[in-house]
Amino acid sequence: MAELDIQISIENIGWPEEETLLAFCGRVLGAAAVYLRDSEKQPFPTMPPEVSLVFTDDASIQDINAEWRGKDKATNVLSFPAFPVQPGKMPGPMLGDIIIARETVEREAHELEKSFDDHLTHLLVHGFLHLLGYDHMNSAEAEIMEGLETRILAQLGLSDPYEGQDLKMEP
């Protein structure tokens, strides 16, 4: 596994214990980093880069979404890169923050007929790619990012989350 310095903050009841989340996220993000390094030639710093993960609730993520994106609604995941980086280029020593809302993850997992862990895995990979400069603001970007997500998730034994769907671009 690629080395990452993962910091976790649990701001809401209902999430697993910190040790459990850290092991789960380490496995998911480590596998994503290895795939990107080995298959996509993504460079990483020699020292393990830091990723901050915040596990919160819908109310908190709605406030953050309103403040930083001008969207006054809850969302599943928000990512805030510490430094601007282009996809495939060397990131800084601090990758940034990924914030995930428990209620939205639970609701979406139920609607998608997936386990909570499988959906959380997808959202962690999605957020991690944002920290590395990937985006889905237009169809070309979405195709690249969603392709990476699908290949990383396949390495983790999960199916294509976009199968049968149009590209998920967000304005």
UniProtKB/Swiss-Prot annotation:
Coiled coil ranges: none
Membrane-crossing segments per the record: none
Listed EC numbers: 3.1.-.-
One biological process term in Gene Ontology: rRNA processing
Cofactor(s) required, per the database record: Zn(2+)
UniProt-annotated binding residues for Zn(2+): H126, H130, H136
GO annotation, cellular component aspect: cytoplasm
Protein name stated in the entry: Endoribonuclease YbeY
Source organism: Rhizobium etli (strain CIAT 652)
